[in-house]
A protein has these predicted regions:
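Acidic, Mg2+-coordinating catalytic modules of nucleic-acid enzymes
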Residues: 52-67, 71-279
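Switch/communication elements of ASCE P-loop NTPase nucleotide-binding domains
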Residues: 1-55, 258-266, 270-279
Length: 279
């Protein structure tokens, strides 16, 4: 029996070995056997299948994909895309990102890298928006040295597994490599370093002399008036406290409609917008 479907529920509950992925191209239609991917990536296939099933993800039917850290990004991204389009960030194009079919997938930096081989296999342009997550060695309560979250200017490395995976791949190192990655190597990455095939990674960058290590801190940095922050502040003043991340995002949308979008998000969205798919 051969069944074609546009149902994310059906596609995600099927065994990978039984799924054939059809994709339009300028040369016609390309068919991909997901069993080929499953055999080549046994370490990740169970995680991907379970995630797609549990979240009812529409990745199979999207022209592009955006992986985000959490609730704040998931709520804010559609509005940020509209803002970028209105501000002319995407330039002049027939179908800007807001008019394209993109899958918005909420998955943290600890797991996003597990999807990258699958994205490469499908050939779908993908933007990974993740957090810098700067950390440094500090003596913990037990007297042992542990990794503690610190402001970017004091950071030694990152706790973000996806960023570490990315840097290791750029340096030709195996995934199992445990050597320390200096934060300066991460923060100095060029646009070319942040792009691998049809995948692009974006994280917080310095703006107005400071750099946050999360979305919330980056937003507070470029919207200082709204958060009663002056020009003479430190990275410690950017720290997000109190409200839940969902409340933070909703408050921003409802109470500060003219907010500024952080540069790393604008540049990442522009990269994704510029990736051409069959029209």
């Amino acid at each position: 029996t051969f069944l074609t479907s546009h149902s994310a529920h059906i596609a995600n509950t099927m065994e990978f070995a039984k799924v054939r992925y059809a994709q339009k191209s300028n040369a016609g239609v390309i068919y991909k056997n997901l069993n080929t991917f499953a055999r080549a990536n046994p370490e990740n296939v169970d995680f991907i299948r379970k995630y797609l099933t549990l979240t009812k993800c529409d990745l199979f039917f999207a022209d592009k994909a955006i992986f985000v850290e959490g609730a704040s990004e998931r709520l804010l991204l559609p509005d940020m895309i509209e803002k970028c389009e209105t501000a002319g960030v995407f330039g002049s194009c027939k179908y800007p990102l807001s008019a394209q079919y993109y899958a918005l997938i909420e998955i943290g930096g600890a797991y996003a890298h597990k999807f990258i081989p699958f994205i490469d296999f499908l050939g779908v342009p993908c933007l990974i928006l993740t957090d810098l997550d700067s950390v440094a060695d500090r003596v913990g309560e037990s007297g042992k040295v542990v990794k503690k979250s610190v402001v970017v200017s004091q950071g030694e490395t990152t706790s973000n597994e996806t960023i570490k995976w990315w840097v290791r791949r750029n340096n030709g190192l195996p995934e199992c490599d445990t050597s320390k990655i200096d934060l300066t190597e991460i923060t100095s990455m060029t646009t070319a370093n942040k792009t691998r095939g049809k995948c692009h990674i974006a994280f917080q960058t310095a703006e107005r002399g400071l750099c946050g290590h999360s979305l919330e801190e980056a937003i507070r940095n470029v919207n200082r008036t709204h958060y009663d922050l002056g020009d003479s502040i430190s990275e410690e003043d950017l720290e997000f406290k109190g409200k839940s991340k969902t409340d933070f995002a909703l408050d921003l949308i409802c109470e500060c409609s003219g907010y500024c979008v952080p540069d790393y998000i604008k540049s990442g969205l522009k990269w994704l917008n510029d990736q051409r798919v069959l029209e």
